[in-house]
Amino acid sequence: MNLLNLPKIELHCHLDGSLRVETAIELAKKEGVKLDSYEYDKVKELLVIPKECNSLEDYLNRFALPVKLLQRAENLERVAFELMEDASKENVKYIEIRFAPLLHLEKGMTQKEVIESVIKGIRKAEELYDIKGNLILSCLRHHSIDSVYEVIEEGKNFIGKGVVAIDLAGGELENFVKPYEEVMKLARKAGFRVTIHAGETGYGKNVRDAIELLGAERIGHGLFIFNDEEAYNLVKEKGVTLEMCPKSNIDTKGVNKYEEHPIYKYHKDNIKVNLSTDNRTVSNINLTEEFENVHKTFNIDFEDYKKIYLNSVEASFCSEELKEKLKLSIII
């Protein structure tokens, strides 16, 4: 299989974890952000996960510089455009980009301006490249629940205009779900689709709770459903798609190597999986490389690939009309 040329769907990709190193250097100089060095390799070290990373918390530290650099509308628009451009070059036909709007208000932008600027970058790329994109608004679990209400209140104005879903992200504690039950009910009522980061760091039960209490239609990672039989069966029975990012899970020590990752086992047991990068820069990976690693490890064939692709289309939060177009890309 020529994996580069095959069509792809990416459903789990963080904007602030996917900046080009060159762009980070330019923006740091423009914004007067002082760095020890502006040399490519030195800046890359600030953005890409170090080999000695031992946890999700260590991994999340790589976001400090990108967040500093993305406090102006033109910067957000640029990095959204560039992410779409990069994805299009490896034949990604559709991507859902996620980011947390409340992290980008430090220099006076409103949430409305933040969201608009990212959508503008996505739409500009759509005009130039054979790719479509939508936005998922992430809320961070270490922020207050009131902050989720803020995101819903502003974000609902963009549903159907570039925003499709809401997400809970950040460090994952056991039993984090329950306090979000009411606010996620409100989000669903407002028209948001729901995907939740859960089961990334050892707690399969969080996946079960995210589906049952928050109405999650997709799960970010879901790596550890194998340690909770009820969660495993629920995901399988309800056809909930797991947005799986093996390289990221290796980086955060969820697993130690590709051979230990359950993505292929889940796929073969008819659990719906999507393969994504999570953070292209932080994990130093693109989607073609991720597929190559999975192909090399598990010897997936074209039928496996096609099944994952078509499932990813169905699991996406885009329009039915676009889904039908995307399905045609894989008919060979």
Curated annotation (Swiss-Prot):
Family: Belongs to the metallo-dependent hydrolases superfamily. Adenosine and AMP deaminases family. Adenosine deaminase subfamily.
Keywords, sorted A to Z: Hydrolase, Metal-binding, Nucleotide metabolism, Zinc
Substrates-to-products reaction catalysed: adenosine + H2O + H(+) = inosine + NH4(+); 2'-deoxyadenosine + H2O + H(+) = 2'-deoxyinosine + NH4(+)
Descriptive protein name: Adenosine deaminase
Enzyme Commission number(s): 3.5.4.4
Binding residues annotated for substrate, in chain numbering: 14, 16, 170
Protein encoded by which gene: add
GO molecular function term, any single one: 2'-deoxyadenosine deaminase activity
